[in-house]
Amino acid sequence: MKIFISHQQADTALAASIAKRLWLYHTINSYLDVIDPESSKKGDQLGDHIRDELGKCDQLLAVVSYATKGSWWVPWEIGVATEKDYPIATYAGDKTSLPEYLKKWPYLQSEQELDVYAKVSKQAHETYVNNKRHLNEEVSRKSGRRLFYRQLREKLGQS
């Protein structure tokens, strides 16, 4: 399991701390562009690279803050993850008021909620992997995604 952590450059420290916590406390791998030398590409090359990296992940966690309002990449990465039918959640580290389009997905505002997210993510991924043994890819992915959203919203009180 691997999570693509989408963030605006101003939120790099928060995104890195999230990636570290996911790994240290939950052994969940993540993709974070600050440690990727390829992320210095420009334009179409960068877009292609991000698509490739998203293709290696299972879901997207968007780190949002006041600075995200000026970002073009975070909404674009969310759009690519939506096309891929990946589970999506947001992390508002500075208690940022989320724009309407982000309220569609579960949102996290603390390390405790990040831990809940990690546990639910692992469980949904296990469901996906187990279902893939006897169901096709699309049905398995949909089942895991539905479980992810239902359980995470329920545990966060966002039902």
Regions found by a protein language model. Give the residues of each.
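C-terminal interaction surface of TIR/SEFIR-family domains
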Residues: 13, 95-159
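Arginine/glycine-rich "motif VI" loop of SF2 helicases in the C-terminal RecA-like domain
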Residues: 24, 79-94
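Switch/connector loops and helix/strand junctions flanking conserved nucleotide-binding motifs
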Residues: 40, 71-72, 97-102
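Structural motif
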Residues: 59-62
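Short beta-alpha junction loops
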Residues: 66-67, 91-98
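Conserved TIR/SEFIR loop-to-helix hotspot centered on a Trp-containing motif
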Residues: 66-84
